[in-house]
C-alpha cells in the first residue's frame, strides 16, 4: 500500500498549459465579477483556481454569502442547482452540465412522493445530494456535516423520513438511537469500500488510523477511528496526533489533506475488486479546459423554474437556520 502522491502527476507541457489556462481564468473572474466554487472531490488543478474549496455545506454557505455577479460551480449538478436556488438573480455556470450525481438520481420524484404520502405525518429530511424536485417535497435539507446536529433538534416522538442515502441515515440512526424511515439510495463511491479490503489495508499499514465518511457501509464504519463529513475528516487529519491515515472517502480530498499536512501519510482506502468504483467520475468531469470555456461562453447556465425554486428554497433555508 502506498501513500497518495501530490498532485496527480502531469508532464511539463501539461503543467505549462494548465498554468496558462489558470491565468486566463483569473482574468475572466475579474472581468465577470465571478466566484469559482469547487468541491474537494474535483481535480487538483480545479481546486487550485477556485476561490472557495469545500464540502457541500461550506459551498452552500459560500453560494449564499458572496457579492459576485456570476457563480461558477465545479462540482456535480445538484450543487450548482442549489446555488441557483439560493441565488435566482445571479448567473450560475457549470463546466459540464452532464456531471450528475447517481445518488441524487436514485430518488425519482414520483416514487419519493408516493413514499412520503404513505407516511403523511412524517417530517421529511433530505440530504443535499438530491434534486430540486426532491428538495421541494422536503421540510429540511441537510449535509453530512450537519445531519446529526439537525436531527438532534427534532423531537424523538416525531417520525422522520430520511433520504436518499441509506448509509448516512443508518449511521445517524445508530448514533442517536432513533428510528427513521430510510430511502434506499447510496453513493457508489462509498459503497465500493468493503470490510475485507479495508481490514487488509489496516493489516498492511498498522501505524495508520482508518477514517471514514458516513456514506460508507456500516461494515466499514465499525472499524473507523473517526467518522465524519469530508470537512470533518480533513480537520481531523490536521489536528490528530497520528501521522498516517487510511482514508475511506473519494480520494480527491487527499490533495487538500496532503497540502495541509505535508509531513503526514495519506492512503486511499482500497476498493472492492468486484466493484472498482471508488473514484467519482462525475466530479472528475470538471476540467480546467471546461471551466475556462464555460466562463468564456457564459454557458452552460443552470436554470431552475421559479415555482420549483421557491419550494426547494424552503428546506435549504431551514437547514442554514438550524446549522
Curated annotation (Swiss-Prot):
Cofactor note: Binds 1 [4Fe-4S] cluster per subunit.
Source superkingdom: Bacteria
GO MF entry, a single one: quinolinate synthetase A activity
First-level EC class: transferase
InterPro entries: NadA (IPR003473), NadA_sf (IPR036094), Quinolinate_synth_type2 (IPR023066)
GO (cellular component) term, any one: cytosol
Signal peptide positions (record): none
Record key words, sorted: 4Fe-4S, Cytoplasm, Iron, Iron-sulfur, Metal-binding, Pyridine nucleotide biosynthesis, Transferase
Subcellular location(s) per record: Cytoplasm
Any single GO BP term: 'de novo' NAD biosynthetic process from L-aspartate
Binding site for iminosuccinate: 39, 56, 127-129, 144, 213-215, 230
Cofactors required: [4Fe-4S] cluster
Entry EC no(s): 2.5.1.72
Pfam family, one: NadA
SUPFAM superfamilies: NadA-like
The protein's annotated pathway: Cofactor biosynthesis; NAD(+) biosynthesis; quinolinate from iminoaspartate: step 1/1
Main location: cytoplasm
Catalysed reactions, semicolon-separated: iminosuccinate + dihydroxyacetone phosphate = quinolinate + phosphate + 2 H2O + H(+)
UniProt: [4Fe-4S] cluster binding residues: 101, 187, 280
Function of the molecule: Catalyzes the condensation of iminoaspartate with dihydroxyacetone phosphate to form quinolinate.
Family from the record: Belongs to the quinolinate synthase family. Type 2 subfamily.
Protein name, UniProt field: Quinolinate synthase
Originating gene: nadA
Amino acid at each position: 500500500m502506498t501513500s497518495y502522491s501530490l498532485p496527480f502527476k502531469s508532464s511539463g507541457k501539461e503543467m505549462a498549459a494548465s498554468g496558462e489556462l489558470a491565468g486566463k481564468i483569473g482574468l475572466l473572474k475579474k472581468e465577470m465579477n465571478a466566484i469559482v466554487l469547487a468541491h474537494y472531490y474535483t481535480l487538483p488543478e480545479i481546486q487550485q483556481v477556485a476561490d472557495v474549496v469545500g464540502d457541500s455545506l461550506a459551498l452552500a454557505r459560500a453560494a449564499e454569502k458572496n457579492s459576485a455577479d456570476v457563480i461558477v460551480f465545479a462540482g456535480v449538478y445538484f450543487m450548482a442547482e442549489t446555488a441557483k436556488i439560493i441565488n435566482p438573480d445571479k448567473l450560475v455556470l457549470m463546466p459540464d452540465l452532464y456531471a450528475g450525481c447517481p445518488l441524487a438520481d436514485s430518488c425519482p420524484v414520483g416514487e419519493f412522493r408516493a413514499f412520503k404520502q404513505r407516511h403523511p405525518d412524517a417530517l421529511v429530511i433530505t440530504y443535499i445530494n438530491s434534486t430540486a424536485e426532491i428538495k421541494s417535497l422536503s421540510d429540511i435539507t441537510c449535509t453530512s456535516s450537519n445531519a446529526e446536529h439537525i436531527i438532534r433538534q427534532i423531537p424523538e416522538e416525531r417520525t422522520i423520513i430520511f433520504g436518499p442515502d441509506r448509509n448516512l441515515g443508518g449511521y445517524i440512526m445508530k448514533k442517536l438511537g432513533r428510528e427513521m424511515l430510510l430511502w434506499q439510495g447510496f453513493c457508489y463511491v462509498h459503497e465500493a469500500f468493503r470490510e475485507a479490503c479495508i481490514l487488509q489495508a489496516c493489516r498492511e499499514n498498522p501505524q495508520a488510523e482508518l477514517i471514514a465518511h458516513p456514506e460508507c457501509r456500516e461494515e466499514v464504519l465499525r472499524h473507523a477511528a473517526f467518522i465524519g463529513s469530508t470537512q470533518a475528516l480533513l480537520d481531523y487529519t490536521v489536528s490528530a496526533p497520528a501521522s498516517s491515515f487510511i482514508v475511506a472517502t473519494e480520494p480527491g480530498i487527499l490533495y487538500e489533506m496532503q497540502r495541509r499536512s505535508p509531513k503526514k501519510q495519506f492512503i486511499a482506502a482500497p476498493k472492492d475488486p468486484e466493484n472498482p468504483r471508488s473514484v467519482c467520475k462525475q466530479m472528475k468531469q470538471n476540467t480546467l479546459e471546461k471551466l475556462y470555456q464555460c466562463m468564456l461562453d457564459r454557458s452552460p447556465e443552470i436554470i431552475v423554474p421559479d415555482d420549483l425554486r421557491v419550494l426547494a428554497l424552503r428546506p435549504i433555508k431551514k437547514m442554514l437556520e438550524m446549522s
